[in-house]
Design a protein with these regions (language model features):
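Core structural elements
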Residues: 232-245, 265-274, 293-315, 359, ...
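Residue patterns forming the tRNA-binding/recognition surfaces of aminoacyl-tRNA synthetases
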Residues: 1-79, 150, 182, 188-189, ...
Length: 539
């Protein structure tokens, strides 16, 4: 006996006459649309679902025994019982002449009404300006779970009533599942209220989370930690923008001549230019997850962590070189403006707010043109030099971290290279990258000169970097610290070896705990080797 899946009440079937739509002829133009390319799915794998349903079509039962909905436009004669289907209630029965009718109590399947949505909202059946301009539309974005419920029915309804498909591309997205991969449902109680997420993290953070790392048609798991990371990115954009606009208030920013642009300026302009080209290609292919990741990485890493930091020196020393400061501010404003346009489809609220303050004389960001690739913003050599600067900076920071040198301790940096063009370009960067390289002086040479014998070296493409060890480390203090670390590690290794030698532990403890202890022993052993090497190097 069938029962209701929620309350357990016995379900008693009642046979009743239903209204159907004959589907054979309606399905043909919908099938032809996909096969001729007039309609396409992204990703293409959903073509199969569409065609399988239409090529195995069954007549559509459109009557529902519920009160809410559009009532079936069928009227029964109170005298003879015959029915009339009409837009309005008939004045008299064509069979017996009776003037009294009762409308069918059934309502239309909700998908029957929804199938008319693309054109009914535009004034159809009247031939309105909106219908002529907006129909057919370009892209429909929807989930794979309603392809046959809604998408197919909109397509054949569009052909039947207008002679055209309602759209030419169907972009399919997946479902948002909980952190365990389960579909959200009331019965599981695992639903997420988007309004609560928006109140806590903001609408832009939620939007960014839902699209980052996702491919069309694939499900995603929802984690609050991801929304928090998106909120942090929004804060990063906001703070960088505030820094730029705060400094613009103190200066009249004018577009500089090309020859004034520094290598870092040319590099970031080249980067945002390449980003524009790549993102445009991604968006055209509906690779939204790839596109948003690229603009996220560009803003966070290349713009904020590198260019803004390099530009600070020039801005803070405007009295010494006002031309350079103006140039840096113009580049900051220009690149930020373009980055905001690229980010806008994904985070519309924060980008609109910032853009309105950044360039108040321009129209709304929503109404502005999408950025275009510019040939005159391609600077391959500047990009190459900047990659050298980044490699050198990372090498220095990694070496200092290995040697536990605090960031507030500055040292000389020697950069040795046989590439004269590279040295010339690095000369321009010297002052502005000192803070990034944690240096009090940067010395450039063609050959190793005036470098202490005990200086540590870092090999990067095109150059070798030397850091004087005496500037970095108090030898006695470091030896003492390393000795204590050696004692601690020996103690940990002895403890782990003792536990693993205990048969009761290895045979009775959970396997994951035993493995965790083995992992600790391996980790401590490697750390001890590194500490001993450091002690030897300080003798």
């Amino acid at each position: 006996v069938g029962t209701h899946d929620r309350c357990g009440t016995t379900v008693e079937p009642l046979i009743k006459q239903q209204w159907f739509v004959k589907m054979d002829e309606l399905a043909k133009p919908a099938i032809n649309a996909l096969k001729t390319g007039e309609l396409r799915f992204v990703p293409e794998r959903f073509d199969k679902i569409y065609l399988h349903w239409l090529e195995n079509i069954k007549d559509w039962c459109i009557s529902r025994q519920i009160w809410w909905g559009h009532r079936i436009p069928a009227y029964y004669c109170d005298e003879c019982g015959e029915f009339v289907v009409a837009k309005e209630a008939p004045e008299k029965c064509p069979h017996c002449g009776c003037t009294h009718f009762t409308q069918d109590e059934d309502t239309l399947d909700t998908w029957f009404s929804s199938a008319l949505w693309p054109f009914s909202t535009l004034g159809w059946p009247e031939k309105t300006e909106d219908l002529d301009y907006f129909y057919p539309t370009d892209v429909l974005v929807t989930g794979y779970d309603i392809i046959f419920f809604w998408v197919i029915r909109m397509v054949f309804s569009g052909y039947e009533h207008t002679g055209k498909a309602p759209f030419n591309t169907v972009l399919i997205h997946g479902l948002v599942r909980d952190s365990q991969g389960r579909k959200m449902s009331k019965s599981l109680g695992n639903g997420i209220d988007p309004l609560e997420i928006i109140d806590k993290y903001g609408a832009d953070a939620l939007r960014l989370t839902l699209i980052t790392g996702n491919a069309p048609g694939n499900d995603m798991r929802f984690y609050n930690e991801r929304v928090e990371a998106s909120r942090n990115f929004a804060n990063k954009v906001w703070n960088a923008s505030r820094f730029i606009m705060m400094n613009m208030e103190k200066n009249v920013v004018e577009e500089p001549e090309d020859f004034v642009l520094k290598p870092a300026d040319r590099w970031i302009l080249s980067k945002v230019n390449s980003l524009t080209k790549e993102m445009t290609e991604n968006m055209d292919k509906f690779e939204l997850g790839i596109a948003v990741q690229k603009v996220h990485d560009f803003i966070w890493d290349e713009f904020c962590d590198w260019y803004v930091e390099i530009a600070k020196y020039r801005i803070y020393h405007a009295e010494e070189d006002s031309q350079s400061a103006n140039c840096a501010l113009w580049v900051l404003k220009t690149v930020l403006g373009q980055a905001l346009k690229l980010l806008h489809p994904f985070m519309p609220f924060i980008t609109e707010e910032i853009y309105g303050a950044l360039v108040p004389e321009e129209e709304s960001l929503m109404m502005s043109s999408w950025p275009v690739y510019r040939e005159d913003w391609e600077f391959p050599y500047a990009a190459e030099v900047m990659e050298h600067v980044k490699a050198i900076t990372r090498g220095i920071r990694n070496m200092r971290a290995e040697m536990n040198v605090p960031n507030n301790k500055r040292t000389k940096v020697y950069i040795i290279s046989s590439d004269s063009k590279l040295l010339t370009a690095l000369e321009v960067f010297k002052e502005s990258v000192k803070p990034l390289m944690l240096a009090n002086d940067i010395i450039l040479h063609y050959e190793k000169k005036d470098v202490a014998d005990d200086a540590v070296s870092i090999v990067v493409p095109g150059a070798t970097v030397y850091l004087p060890l005496e500037d970095l480390v108090d030898f006695e203090q470091e030896r003492e610290r390393l000795k204590k670390e050696e004692e601690r590690l020996n103690s940990e290794i002895k403890r782990a070896q003792g536990m693993l030698a205990n048969e009761r532990f290895t045979s009775k403890a959970p396997a994951d705990k035993v493995q965790a202890e083995r992992d600790k022993l391996e980790k401590y052993t490697k750390m001890l080797e590194q500490v001993k090497e450091r002690i030897d190097s300080l003798r």
